[in-house]
């Protein structure tokens, strides 16, 4: 006669033990954070930075025109060119230079506004990736660009924190691109400020010629900084997209 199998004893207390509830998420020191796509803002920022580059190239041409007029004043006088002709050429060069300055200012203001929106977007995304990897508050991500002296160092620090939080897990921190962009940005700001003051004080043809050359150098630095900024924006945007797609925890956030 075959005996039915004896029932196996249940583990002690298993029937009465409720299933474990999921652990609550760790609190974030910067407030609620959720992933939002930075792609559209990143592309818009890159396009507007391209507009900044175009305005800077226009400014280089205008500065070169001023340089050329100032350098040929003496030669033109010796060659018999009338004073009226020289004044007309100088006025045209000055008008072109003024138009370039307005173009640069307009392009920079629009690009900076969209860049800041993108910057805040990637900062919040970075908080999802690493809530505790940011030494500065979220509000500083915006205001740090406008506070004198602070804006020379803190935006770069915040960008570095965003970059590190967005890089693939297990990879080393590589901030060479960020550092190169920030270096050219700061040098361009400083050189531009001094050359603008020098250009305003220039009176003689030689002084005007020197100031125009210095302005061309400043515009060239701005162009390099803008090119590097485009690379930073597009690369960081891509890093965040790939991290969100490949990190289950981040994707759920």
Spans of model-derived segments:
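Membrane-interface extramembranous regions at the lipid-water interface
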Residues: 2-5, 16-94, 114-143, 150-186, ...
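Hydrophobic alpha-helical transmembrane segments of multi-pass membrane proteins
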Residues: 99-113, 143-149, 187, 216-224
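Hydrophobic, aromatic-rich alpha-helical transmembrane segments
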Residues: 94, 98-105, 174, 208, ...
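N-terminal hydrophobic alpha-helix used for membrane targeting or insertion
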Residues: 45, 107-110, 211
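Extracellular/periplasmic helix-loop-helix junctions in multi-pass membrane proteins
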Residues: 194-223
